Every structure is written in structure tokens, then in C-alpha cells.
């Protein structure tokens, strides 16, 4: 025992030496110095109560020494150079000076404006000395207060279809009095405008000028009300049944000008086409083209009615130079002396009256038997002949259809044209002569929940005030009037104060809102004008991925404020965004442009910019001046660059910035006041850099920061006061809990504290701290005694003693592990957190983890081997199937190799394991939490599944042995129930110790695999107290409590007692000599002797099957 104690002391001294050589992360944690007395001269008072004072030299040094940050506050240190000081606690950006808004609570920022110089390049001083942004000039708003910024402006004249606001702004007439303000001054919605008798109210909700009523042009698109009951028609007019007068030239032109289409029902069959010899096809841009008489071309009357002039009056000027230039200069000369633009030549549309522009072209293709050839040469499927749809440009496919034979599922019009049978009498005019809607059955009676159209048609109420496809709703569109109070459903778009359309019809290239182009406003279009490089929509210009080397605009499109220039090759210079039209930009995306630097003054005029994206470039540094001018910037994303240095005062002017993303850079050092000026910052992300040191004062004056992300760095040197003066800090993300020890109390910090350690101690629980020493000493001493005791039997060839010796070696190593952890805890007491990372990555911790795994699994597999040996012995007592010593050595050698490999594999450098044993301060790799740390599957396989199988094997084997032994005794000696009870107790003790050790770990492991999390203290108790339990109890169960050991101890105690008595009496003649042949009375009567005699009698009188000694004597 003395030798053992000496060995233990030597080991502890060695461990202490190794621990002393480890270098911890320098957290600059100093011993707390006595507080500076506030009464001493030369100190600064942090608060009015004089509870904390610091040296005067610490004031305004960039490091918050006061817990409340008072030594670095505005009250103490004043404002930055780019700021204006309102009072002793408040600063504002200088750009807010003299802007007619009291940004200071005392109004100080709006005083003495007559001598204040406005920011050059971005603002202009007007007559009353206030500063107005350049883009606010001539914006129809009085920004100065005296309207001086709106007086010297060039305004355009409003056209006839526009309303002139009181401030001279022009808006479309369709927007007048629709409930939405379009004039900046709101004059389009005021009472004066809307109650005026200058306007005519259409049933669909829009207003038109009264001079547009009865002007021959329909402005009330749904009802034609502005053109009804106007006058008696002239001789050159045609009168519709609804009283509208139209030009006779528009009768039978293929377009319904009358609401009831009267003008197209009086036509002869031969007028359903547009033959070139007598007719002229209008080149209509909107809707169905008209076919007019040739005599109406160039007659100075708009007969095509497809614009203010009409395409029939285009190219009518007799240009004397037309013959000379002809096609060479871009013209084609018609015989009727009309000059056509070159692109109209051979375009399959005759523009010359007799079609000369289409005669000298390529020969028309030859059509197949299944095709019909139009007169101008185009081939169309024969099935489209006479189907009431104009497929040929000259409508020749719908001519001469009187004798046309319709298909089986079609119905023939009086004109011979064919329409589908289900379209007959459907309230829609399908036949060119309207015969499909004549002689129809009486109109049906509408049901109570249906809506009746003016034409008698019944429709579903859900179709009311919804403009759908051609056959949705009323054919006469009466369901679309009086819809000003209708509420659109989800997925619908409201046409201002009128009906609704499906959202899919918005920005589809077709105007569906009849009163205005509301559904086609703010749609995506190609820009800049005439270049088609980018796509614009609303205020956004998207030039992403166009390989641009310079900005594509020389003059910014009106109202564009969001520029997306990402994924290009832009060459950024100090003048790239210097033009005045960039000062209204609020969002700028320059990501993925291969930028290597940001020249100073690059954004000096972009004071309205709120979002700047510089991510994923090759920027290596940020210079002082690179971000100058971005005083209103709120979010800066510069992640994914190669930034190594950030110059001082780089962010000093960005006082409104709230989000700064500097992740994925190459920063190595965060110096004092690096983020000076970021007073409104709430999120600071400097994760995934190469930061190894952070100075005190690095986050100075970030009074509003709520989240700081430091994860993904290799920080080795960090100031103790680095997180002081951050009163609103809510969350801190790091890679190690040691940094959380510096954060203010109440901050949510990750990663979480491990289950064992605190900022001060490796073992934070005092009970566990004592337990680990107790269990370690018991396991070490107890198993050493067992090894010493069993070696004599091993030399005698006893297999069982050999196995017990292996078990004791495994448990002895567990004691070594416990004492390593206990010694480390003692050594690091009070300063553990500064050595946390280095300890967990140290070779000693890795060795401790190896020893714990090796010990645990060696014990488990050895117990399983012992159990199987006993089971075979009980089940087959007559066979010589027990392990011999040689076989036992082979088995245990295999087990030693296996557990060695299991324990050493995580130390071989595989990336899968990643500090497998250093996941906690006690160097254990147990997986009993939901965290999926590297190597967790391996941990589950070794500590959960393997141990579960071993426990099931041991428990079931002992139950089987007890059952067999009990039946044997019942058959032979029913009187020996006492021995049965003793055997049952020993078996129960063996199984229950295994149960208490392994089952909690196994259960907790499976619970964690299901995603549940137990209390951290549960894990700590199981890992430190429960896991080593078997190592402390196995020596007692398998050796120290057995009859041979107890008998030997008693015998030696008697020897010692007799020797001690004889030494006092002086009688040495009868001293005890153990020669193996003589036996003293004490020995003969000793309990050990009685047990031996009892065992021999049992063997002589019992059947050979009963072999109980190995179960409860364990000799």
C-alpha cells in the first residue's frame, strides 16, 4: 500500500507538471484591482452616486472602463467630426442641419441657417437659407417653405387627355376623382375638381371632359354614353339603333362601331373579305383592323380610326424627293405618289393602294392540298376557311363562303360561315352577319342568386364586376358598370375605382383596365431607352449578369432609385456615381463584380443610399473615405471579400447604419475604435474571418448593438473589457463559451456552457468535485488490491482469477482517468475558462478520453466474458467446455486489441472525429444530448449499442443461471434455501450495479437520438458519478466481498493479533508458523475453514450438475 501511495503521488506531480506547461487563450483576465476611491483627485466619476470611478486618463480613450460607458459617452467626449451636437447627450448628422425639420429636440439644428454652408454636391441653398436636396428641385413640392425651389422650372403643357394639377403637374384624365391621389398637391381629388361641371361621368366610374362628349370618339368604353343622343346624323353618317352617329365609311368595315353592331349586319356576302382591287386594309395597332374603301385613303378624313390621324392618312405627303431616294434612302414610292418607309416593303401587308409594295417580292409558297392560300400568298390550314375568324391579312379566307360545307360539329351562318354549335345563341355575335343570335329561344328566367344583364343574359354573381375572358360575364359588359364600391377578391387586381381583373392579366401586354392603363403601369420594360440592356420595373433597374464594364445610363430614367448591377465586370472609379441623377438612389447592388478596391469618394453624392451590397468581390481593404457620403446607409453587406485591413474612421460618417456584414473576410485583428461612428448599429457580423486578437474598445460606443457574431474565428487574444459599454447587447455568437464569460450578465451567448464547467472551474458542481476524487481513489486503490490479490491465482493457472485481473486492470484505468480530471480541476481552479480550449485540445485531455473509453469498454467486454464462462459452467457441468487459461489469454488478447482500436481510432486524425474527446471539459465522448457533434454516430455505436448488448447478455445470463441453479437445488436439497437466498442476493447485486451504471446512459442516449434534451446536471451526474460506478463496485463484488478473500483477511488478522499478544507476553515458543502441514485451532475453527468444508461436502453429496462455488465464493 505504501508503494501504491508513492506511485499515486508521483503520477499527480507529473500531471501537475504537464498542466503547468499548457498555454491557455489570453483573455487578459486580470486580478480585480481595488476600486479607485472617488474622493481621490484625478479620478472620473462614472455615475452620480459615485459607485464607480476610473482614472482620469481612461476618459475618452476608446475603451469603456465604466460599466455604463459614461467615460466614452457623448456627454463626456462630444460628437464626431461628421456630427452636430444638439445638447450634452445627443448628436445628429450634419446633413440634417437647416432642412426645415427640428431633428434636435431644442431646435438648435435649424438656427443660424443664413451662415450655414449646405453640403456641397448634394444640397442647394434657396432664398430662405434652408438646404434642399438637388433632386427635390422642381418636384412639384414646396420643400423650401417659400416655394422658391419650384419657381424656376420648365413645365410641359398637358395634352388634351390629361388633367392639369394646381401645381402644373399633368396626370391622366382617367385618374381624376378616382379616390387615389395622383397630383402631388392632391388637386385631382379635391372638391373643386370633382364637383366641377366641366366633366362628364361615365357609368364605369371615370370622368371625361365635356368637350369630349359627342365628338365622334367613344370615351365611355362600356356604355358609349358620351356618344348617344347627341344630334341628328348628317347625310354622310350612319345612325345606329342606339342613336349613335358614325361615318358611312365605317359601315361594313369589319368593326362594330355601333354598340349593337348594326353597322355590320347590312353587308353583302362579298364584303366579308378585303379584296385589294376595291378595299384598303388599315394597319391597326390596337384591336381588329378595319377594311375601308380605296377611295377613302388620303382623303384627309380619319377613316381607319386607329389613332389621332389614322393609318389611311399616313405617308400621304407628296415628297418631291421620294422618287430620287427610293429604297436606297429608306423609302418606297407608290404609284399613287405615297412614300412608304422601307420596312413596309414586302411585309405581306399591302400599303400601296393597289399593293405594289408586295408585288416584286419572293414568289409565294406553294400550298398543300390541306391548306388554303390567301390572296397575298400565305398558306393556312383548310379547316380555318370560313370559320368567322380572319386568318389571312386580306380576309380572303372569309370570302365567298355561301356554299361552304360545315363540319359535323359546326353550324352554318346565313352567310355560309361556320361556328361551333355551342356558340349558337350564346349572346355573343359569332357569325359575320349576326345570324347566330337571331330567332333564338326566349331568354331564360334568372334564378334568385343570379345577376341579369341588360341583354337578358343570366350570370353567376361571382362574375359581377370582374372582367374575365370573352365569354365570362355579360356579353354586353353590363356587369362591369357601377362597380366603384366592389371589393376585389384575393388574386384579383382592381382597376382603380372600377371593376376587377385577374392578377394574371396584369403586365401581360394587353390593356384590360378600359379607363386607363393601370394594369400595364409600372411593368417590366427594357431600359435604358433605346438600348435594351437592363430591365426596369417601377423604381428598379435590373442589369444583373450583363457583363457591363461601366454604368449603362448617361441620364437616369425618371423615378429609378433601385439599381441592381450585380454579377458584372464594373470598373468602379471615384466618378462612376458622381452624376447628379445618382443622388436619389436608395438601393445599390454591386455584388460579384470582381472589384478589388473601393476608391475614395466613390459614393460621396449618394447620401440617400440606404442599402449597399458589395458582397462576393475581391476587395482587400477599406480605406478612410471609401464609404464617405453614405450618411443615411442602413445596411452594408460586404461579406465574401478578401478584406485584410480596415483603416481608422472608415465608418465614422455612417451614423444610421443598422446592419454591417463583414463575414468571410481575412481580418486578423479588431483594433480599438474600428467601428467608431456606428451608433445605430444593431447587427454586427464579423464571423468566419481569421481574427486572432480583439482589443479592448473594439466595440466602443456601439450603444444600440443587439447581436455580435464572432463565430468561425481563431481568437487567442481578447480584452477583458471588450464587451463593456454595450447596454443593449442581447445575443453573442462565438465558437467557445470562454468568450461568454466576458459578456454582460443576461446576454444570450452561444455555444452554451458545457455540462461540467463554469467560467471559473472545470468542475462547477462541488458535490461532483468531491465525488470524482472519492470514486477515483476507490477505483484506483480497490482495483490495485484486486490485481495484487489475483496475481497469485493467475500464477496457479486459475482462469477465473485471470479474467478478474483483466477486469480490475480496466477499472484501475478508470481510476486513473478520474484522478487526471480531478487533478486538472484542482490546477485550473478559479481560472479555468482562460485555459478551456487549450485543455480540451491538449494531449493530456486526449489521453484521458482514450483511457476512459479503453477502461469502460475493457470492463464491459471482460464482464461479458466472465458471465459467459459462468453460464457455460452452469449449463454444462459435465462437459469440459470451460475456458482454459490459454483460451482465456487468447480471448482477452482479442478484447484488448479491439478496445484499443475503438479508443485510439478518434486520435488518428480523421476529420470525421474533429476533437472527439475534447467536446467537454471532462474529455468524455458520450452522446447523451441532441447535439449532432462530429463523430456522434461512432459514440452511439460504442457507448450505447455495444453496452446495451453487453448488459442484455449479462442480465439474461444471470437470470438463466439463477433459474437453473434453483431448480437443481429443489430437486436435491430442498432444505438449503439459505444458500439460494445468498446466491439470489449476489446475482441481484451483480445485475443491479450493471443496471445502475449502463441503463441511465443507454436510456439517455436513445432519448437524445429522438431529439429530447435532459437537464445539463443530469448529464454531468451520469458522466462523472454513474459511469465510473462499476469501476468502484466491481472490486467489492468480484473479490473483496468473497469468502476466500474475507477468510484470508481474517486469518492474517488473527496472525497479526497473536503475534501482537505474544510480543507483549514474551512467549515465543508457541508462535505461529504456517508450514502448510500444521493447523492451529483458530485456523481449524475459522469461518474460511468452515466454508471450505461445507463446499466439499456439497460437492460429495450433490449431483455433479450443481456447481455453485463460482457464483458466490469466487475463489
Curated annotation (Swiss-Prot):
Question: Which segments sit on the Extracellular face?
Answer: 25-767, 823-857, 909-941, 1010-1017
What is the name attached to this protein's record?
A: G-protein coupled receptor GRL101
User: What's the stated role of this polypeptide?
Assistant: Might directly transduce signals carried by large extracellular lipoprotein complexes into neuronal events.
The record's similarity note reads:
Belongs to the G-protein coupled receptor 1 family.
Q: Which domain of life is it from?
A: Eukaryota
Show the GO MF annotations: G protein-coupled peptide receptor activity
Record keywords: Cell membrane, Disulfide bond, G-protein coupled receptor, Glycoprotein, Leucine-rich repeat, Membrane, Receptor, Repeat, Signal, Transducer, Transmembrane, Transmembrane helix
The GO biological-process annotations, alphabetized, read as: adenylate cyclase-activating G protein-coupled receptor signaling pathway; hormone-mediated signaling pathway
Signal sequence segment: 1-24
The UniProt entry, under SMART domains, shows: LDLa (SM00192), LRR_TYP (SM00369), LRRNT (SM00013)
InterPro entries in alphabetical order? GPCR_Rhodpsn, GPCR_Rhodpsn_7TM, LDL_receptor-like_sf, LDLR_class-A_CS, LDrepeatLR_classA_rpt, Leu-rich_rpt, Leu-rich_rpt_typical-subtyp, LRR_dom_sf
Q: Which CDD domains match?
A: 7tmA_Relaxin_R (cd15137), LDLa (cd00112)
Residues of this chain annotated as glycosylated in UniProt = 87, 166, 269, 318, 482, 502, 571, 618, 624, 685
Q: What is its main location?
A: membrane
> Among the entry's GO cellular component annotations, what is one?
plasma membrane
- Where in the numbering of this chain does the LDL-receptor class A domain appear? 36-79, 77-115, 116-155, 156-196, 195-232, 231-269, 272-318, 320-363, 365-403, 404-442, 444-485, 486-525
Name the membrane topology term.
Answer: Multi-pass membrane protein
Residues assigned to the Cytoplasmic compartment are: 789-801, 879-887, 963-988, 1039-1115
Subcellular localization is given as: Cell membrane
Specify the LRRNT domain's residue ranges. Answer: 518-562
Q: Which cysteine residues pair off into disulfide bonds?
A: 38-53, 46-66, 60-77, 79-91, 86-104, 98-113, 118-131, 138-153, 158-170, 165-183, 177-194, 202-220, 214-230, 233-245, 240-258, 252-267, 274-291, 282-304, 298-316, 322-339, 334-352, 346-361, 367-379, 374-392, 386-401, 406-418, 413-431, 425-440, 446-458, 453-474, 465-483, 488-500, 495-513, 507-523
